Amino acid sequence: MDHTECNNRIEYLQNKVLELESLNENLKGQLEYFQTKFLESNLNSEGKDISSCLTEIYNSLSLDNNNNNSNSNSNSNNNSSNSNNNSYSNFNSNNNTTNNTKVIKNRNFKINLTNSNSTNSSPYIFGNNKDNSNNSNNSNNNNSNTELSNDHLSLEDNIATTNTTTTTTINTSNSNNSNNNNNNNNNNNNNNNNNNNNNNKPTSNRPPVAPRSFIRSNSDTFITPPGSPTSSRNSPTNKSSPQFLSPLSKSPLSQSTQSTTVSSPSPSWTTTVPQSKMRSETIVQSKSPYSPDTNISNKLINELASNIGAPNSNGSESPSKNSPRSLNSNNNNSSATTSITTPPTTSTPTPTTSTTTTTTTERRPEDRRSKTSPFPNVGTTTPPLSNSAHLVRTQSASGANAVKPQSQLSTSCTVNMIGGGGTPRSNNSSNGSLYHSMSSNGLIENLSTSSSLSLSSTSPSPNNSQQNLTNPFEIGADDELEVLDDPRLVMVKTENGFIVKGGTIEKLVNRLIAKHDPDFTSAFLLTHKSFTTSIELLDLLIEFYVNNKDSSSINSNSSSSSSSAVASSSFSNINCNISDLSSSTSSTNSLLINSITNSPIINSNNQNNQNNNNNNNNNNNNNNNQLEINGDKKKKAIRLKITNVIKSWVDKHYYDFSEDKQLTLKLDQFITNHIMFDMDKIGFNLKRLLTNDRVVPVPTFTQGPPTPIPPKMKSNGSEINFKDLDPTEIARQLTLYESDLFRKIGAKECLGQAWNKDGKEENAPNIVSFIKRFNQVSSWVATEIVRQEKLKDRVSYIKRFILVAQECRKLNNFNATMEILSGLQNSSVYRLRKTWERVESKPLLKNTLDELMSLMSSGANYKNYIQELHNIHPPCIPYLGVYLTHLTFIEDGMKNVLTTTTATTTNTTTTTTTTTTTTTTNTTTSNNNNQQQLNGANRSFDDVIINFEKCRKISVVIREIKQYQQQQYHLHTEEFTLRYLSNLPSIQTQKSMYKLSLICEPKEKETSSFDSGYGSVSDRPSKKEFSVTSLLNSFKS
């Protein structure tokens, strides 16, 4: 493999990388668009499901696409008609043909593409210089005239270049100078009209769609890159154009497709205008990885044009980009496709035309981070990708008129003055010196000055002008690595990506708004009261919202003033340089220079410079307007995200507002003054949620509730006792009663071990009530058993309680099951050996008890119970003691604060070390330390790194509790049974129950018959698995 082929392969692979990067950015932009539209549709909807929202978005794309297609067609026609009247340089045409001229304007030059009739038209052109030169030599009758003219030039130069294959000639005459002002004025008027038309175009919110897949040829094999020996385009016998299959229609593309090809020693690019566009092809034009306003095809064509002046591989210098070129392309095969071939030239100096405004592209390191806006550009289409024998980039003709961004341009103004009949000399100097060349009397052969006339003026950069528009929390997927270096936000990488481990309050709110992370949002809103207050959180959200308001006049004044300053400084520098030049020459030369300065040529040049500056001002204003539109779209997306956070907060955590009237009033004022002003329908929905005017979901059941079982009524009218109630109905009514208590538990009651601290009746009233109910039922079970003096009655009561526990298990009431088993394991009941001997003598009853004991066993951290809980279908009532135990371990074992930003900056490993979970033996000391950490850093959030990992673990427990609170039981109330369970009979204390137990079965010697049959008490694993004392102590206040 030779050196040339290797370079071609490298360039081919680099181009493929650019295509893949563009495809990736298109997909990112499309995803951001759908997320934004889904948020907006979700905020406006009233009970719509996801599929309905997505269907509306999809239908809106169809309508936007049809409108945009009609607009783009009309705009392209207008541009074509305007460009035919405003061409400055005309090519020599030897034959009279009817030409259809199209204009592709690219910043400071435009290409007039003149297509003539031909019998052969190919939709794609291979970028082979050898083939192009052969085709141009075979041209006789039909002309394909191509004009390459500068927007602000009127002079035509006669340039003779030496080349063995193609000769390029431009005739220059001084008679054209008199037409400068008229042509420039007409051009300025047309440009202003085009700018006004572009500004009046309706904006579209359609998403950028990924380019089409690679277009393969008839064979499925990989296409050889350009320059390889096996490439089909190098074969001299290959005369016909290859057939390309469309990925949408799976048929060869129509040959009536008009395209424009720029051929050069490097791979060429094609501008294609298909006759008809499908909706997936013309949804929207994506942004290139190079600039926010141009697509890939235009960018690469601009780079190709800017590299013409650089030395080529043969060591010869290509013509300068500053001079316009007229190429006579006599190719009879290019009627539908006009190619501009730039041949290699010798080192002969190339002249520059009068008053040239050059555009240089600054080379910068490649930035592969996503620059995709959540909203697409206006009036552009997606360039489909192709995979032909060489790289072919296609786009619509209307998309070729995109203006390059000002941030990557530096405008240089150079004055080159020539006398009558003189030949201009090429400006090969890098400092842009002023050259005078006159042939009359040979007075001045070559005169140059050391003072440069090259004025470099940088127009306002989009980055600089949009500093106020950028939001401080726009964190994309590709920016996570930068966030890792932020000392105020601690992040760790997991299998599912990066997660937040800690951060300041501002950074956490920043992340809450910027990233669509339901887990993070839920964890933050559930646990925010552990490190801040609801009022302060609302203040931060309001601040972010107000800072992202639309601003329509941020860039207009600054851009106009800077442009006028550039224009004035341009003329002052020119006059200064001319005066310096006249002072440094002899008197004879000074007279000549004065006559040159006052000549009509210089006056017309000054007029041209003024027109150029006016056009630049118009372009700057258009760019600034586009930047402002894009900035407003980003701000609108940010405001939608903030509004969605507020909606989630009010909808799913309304208890924060129902208990804080000041918070409700402040949010109501914010909705009225800001959200309803920007988005009235969304504001109305938020107000409805804030007033708790929401639709309460009514559960629907496929089957009716079971028929209640009434108790056995006594004939004498005495009170009902436990034996009169049915075990199944006891389980049902017990479940209904405890379900109401469980569903009242709020998320804030689970924070900070509020159920174990002072003021628990106020901070966690529902958890305290639930714990009291658990202890009450357990004591009631034990009391009912020890009150029975007869052995037979005690066995009967134990049997009934086991049956009630079994029915509670069938109803998924694990809490009641645990209550009954705790009562059976009470020390006063457990010591009744004779009673348990009778119970275990019944195999069916014993097996049922063993199954329940095994299910609710505390071994392996309640492994069997947790596994069963996750396998059942709600409704259910979980055993609350497991959740309270987990919350206690998290609160005691993890700190509330990781470290400060200063410590994080100096030592990064300290942040990671402090997140390790440590178990403390003194619960009171740990709680006091955590509280002191928050109180010591009270409201100084700039220095506090909140341990969000602790908040996340707490939120996991709270979310599981809330998950089982959603669905209610479908049971009827039985009045007598529920009244009995609500007012349980008098319950004895532990000492009283133990005395009753001694009455039932007095203490016996260790050699009793019971001990001889079962051994010691420790030999009964099914009964010894529970420790009633530990259970009761864990729920004591």
Curated annotation (Swiss-Prot):
Biased composition annotated in UniProt, kind: Polar residues: 229-239, 282-300, 372-387, 424-437, 1027-1037
UniProt feature, compositional bias: Low complexity: 114-145, 166-200, 240-276, 318-360, 907-930
Gene Ontology molecular function, alphabetical: guanyl-nucleotide exchange factor activity
Segments of skewed composition (Basic and acidic residues): 361-370
Domain N-terminal Ras-GEF, residue spans: 496-694
Ras-GEF domain boundaries: 726-1003
Coiled-coil residue spans: 5-35
Alphabetized InterPro entries for the sequence: Ras-like_GEF, Ras-like_Gua-exchang_fac_N, Ras_GEF_dom_sf, RASGEF_cat_dom, RASGEF_cat_dom_sf
Ranges for region Disordered: 65-100, 114-150, 166-387, 414-437, 451-472, 602-628, 907-935, 1004-1037
Highest taxon above the source species: Eukaryota
Keywords of the record: Coiled coil, Guanine-nucleotide releasing factor
Disruption phenotype annotation: Poor in phototaxis assays.
GO CC annotation, single: plasma membrane
Keyword Metal-binding: no
SMART domains: RasGEF, RasGEFN
GO BP annotations listed: cellular response to differentiation-inducing factor 1; positive phototaxis; protein localization to nucleus; Ras protein signal transduction; thermotaxis
Free-text function comment from the UniProt entry: Promotes the exchange of Ras-bound GDP by GTP. Seems to play a role in chemotaxis.
Protein name as it appears in the record: Ras guanine nucleotide exchange factor E
Species name: Dictyostelium discoideum (Social amoeba)
